[in-house]
Amino acid sequence: MLFGVKDIALLEHGCKALEVDSYKSLMILGIPEDCNHEEFEEIIRLPLKPLGKFEVAGKAYLEEDKSKAAIIQLTEDINYAVVPREIKGKGGVWRVVYMPRKQDIEFLTKLNLFLQSEGRTVEDMARVLRQELCPPATGPRELPARKCSVPGLGEKPEAGATVQMDVVPPLDSSEKESKAGVGKRGKRKNKKNRRRHHASDKKL
């Protein structure tokens, strides 16, 4: 997590005033004025438990933020893998500030100087990175409904359109035979009619 110059400077200033090692300390910001000491210790107990033993070294009221800040002294070096970035506390989310690794200080110093020259803050950069790396998820798009009709003779169905046609059930054997018989009788009648026509022509 990246912190601004003000956050790091405030942590160093607090640790220097309390004579504690800044690389073995945390600073918690955003504590409301009406949060007493017992409530505060109960809230931070579980989130800071993975860091080992700790104690509250001191607190200060920040006029600019209208809230309190607390310096937490650890007995062991900061475990960067488990240190919380935020704590859900009374009145909202409390920010946790800690000193970055020593090899990262030079990089962060240059980064902060660059952001200042551009009129930007660390928060601005973090917001842009979140937008670029984690774009808002969009649900699956639904295709618009299309009306499909059976094409006429000589017409081709549109691409992607599904054509529903009524299926005529096949004829069984009895129906086939009956229709075949009707067809034969019809042919015989036609032959007889032709013969009659020929006979009448001869008489004339």
Swiss-Prot record:
It comes from the Eukaryota. Residues 135-204 are annotated as: Disordered. Residues 182-204 have a biased composition (Basic residues). It holds the Pfam family PNMA_N. PANTHER family: PARANEOPLASTIC ANTIGEN, PARANEOPLASTIC ANTIGEN-LIKE PROTEIN 8C. Belongs to the PNMA family. This is Paraneoplastic antigen-like protein 8C. The gene is PNMA8C.
